[in-house]
Structures are given as structure tokens and as C-alpha cells.
């Protein structure tokens, strides 16, 4: 059983606050520090932009909070390693939001692979498309489509391979809808 006690959002507005209170959230704040200092809170869900993930993971781990964080942890491998190490050193659980592993359709494919029903995996080919382009403001802080969304495909490839290490990755992409995405340096 989970109780959401506090939601922190630096962009909190009256409408969002009203909605959260209607959902039973006791506290709303613009400052994440309020959550980290609350000893009654055991775990945090970090669903901010990618450029803040490692910072919040480190702060939450140091505050003794278990962590579920949206992917990816960071675009900088050094910061990723620091965040993971900080969580390990603090003895808190850290889970990254690779939600496709828990989707029943993807899980069905995994189960068929593991049972041998569809044979031995030799190659995995994944095609992905988002239903709509992200807002350009998000593209600028998310790391772009490869960091933000294609990471799911890489995770699924490793998951479906059942422990076998990936030996080669080929990726291609292009901007077909909103030229501003390409101008922001994505794809």
C-alpha cells in the first residue's frame, strides 16, 4: 500500500495544487527539499527532466529515501556512476523506470523467448515511433529522442536477450515532423 504524502513541483500552480488535493495529496510544494527533510517519507518518485535526475537521486539517497527515477539517470556517465554509487553507499533501493519490462505485451514476448517457443535469439530488431513529437523545451533538457526514448529499446534488447551481452548496435533516425527538433541538436 502506498500513500502519496507530498508532491514537489517547481512549476506548481493553483490548478495543479487543486487537482492534487482532490486526489488526496496532503502536501504540495515547489521545493523538493521539503520531501527530503520529511522523516515520514520512505521513498521518492523522481519524474523531473533528465538534466535533474542524478542530482535528485544523490540528494534523495543521502536523505535515506528509496528511489524510483524515470530514465535515464543522466547523459553523463560519470554522474550516472556517482548516483548509483551514492544509492549503494546509502543502502537505499534505486529503480530506474524501464516500464516496458512490465508491459504485458513485452512480457509476453520475453516469456516466449525464455521458454524457447520462438527459438534461439540471434538478432533483435526494434522499430520505435512516438505518437507525437515532444515539446521543443523538453527536447532541450531531455537529451533528445535517443537518450529519452530509445533507451527503452536498448533495455528491451538486453532484457529479451536473457542475459546475453549485446555485441553490436546499429541505430538510425531522422527528423520528419518538427524541424526545431533537429535544430536543437536531436537526431
Task: Annotate the PLM regions.
Residues 3-4, 40-43, 66, 92-93, ...:
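Structural signature of beta-strand start/N-cap positions in the alpha/beta core
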Residues 9, 123-126, 168-171:
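Hydrophobic/anchoring residues in structured secondary elements
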Residues 2-6, 25, 42-44, 144:
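Short active-site oxyanion
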Residues 51, 74-135:
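A contiguous active-site-proximal alpha/beta segment in oxidoreductase catalytic domains
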Residues 5, 134-187:
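Rossmann-like dinucleotide-binding domain that binds NAD(P)(H)
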Residues 29, 68, 93-95, 125, ...:
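Structural detector of well-ordered beta-strand residues that form the stable sheet scaffold
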Residues 1-23:
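N-terminal Rossmann-like dinucleotide-binding module
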Residues 23-86:
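Beta-loop-alpha module in the N-terminal Rossmann-like domain of NAD(P)-dependent dehydrogenases
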Amino acid at each position: 500500500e502506498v500513500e502519496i504524502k507530498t508532491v514537489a513541483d517547481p512549476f506548481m500552480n493553483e490548478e495543479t495544487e487543486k487537482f492534487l488535493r482532490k486526489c488526496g495529496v496532503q502536501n504540495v510544494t515547489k521545493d523538493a527539499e521539503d520531501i527530503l527533510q520529511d522523516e515520514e517519507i520512505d521513498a521518492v518518485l523522481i519524474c523531473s527532466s533528465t538534466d535533474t535526475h542524478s542530482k535528485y537521486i544523490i540528494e534523495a539517497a543521502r536523505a535515506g529515501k528509496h528511489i524510483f527515477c524515470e530514465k535515464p539517470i543522466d547523459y553523463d556517465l560519470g554522474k550516472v556512476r556517482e548516483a548509483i554509487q551514492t544509492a549503494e553507499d546509502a543502502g537505499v533501493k534505486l529503480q530506474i523506470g524501464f516500464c516496458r519490462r512490465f508491459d504485458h505485451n513485452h512480457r509476453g514476448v520475453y516469456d516466449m523467448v525464455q521458454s524457447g517457443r520462438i527459438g534461439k535469439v540471434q538478432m533483435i530488431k526494434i522499430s520505435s515511433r512516438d505518437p507525437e513529437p515532444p515539446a521543443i523545451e523538453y527536447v532541450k533538457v531531455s537529451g533528445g529522442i535517443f537518450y529519452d526514448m530509445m533507451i527503452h529499446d536498448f533495455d528491451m534488447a538486453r532484457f529479451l536477450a536473457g542475459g546475453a551481452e549485446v555485441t553490436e548496435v546499429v541505430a538510425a533516425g531522422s527528423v520528419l515532423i518538427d524541424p526545431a527538433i533537429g535544430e536543437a541538436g536531436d537526431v
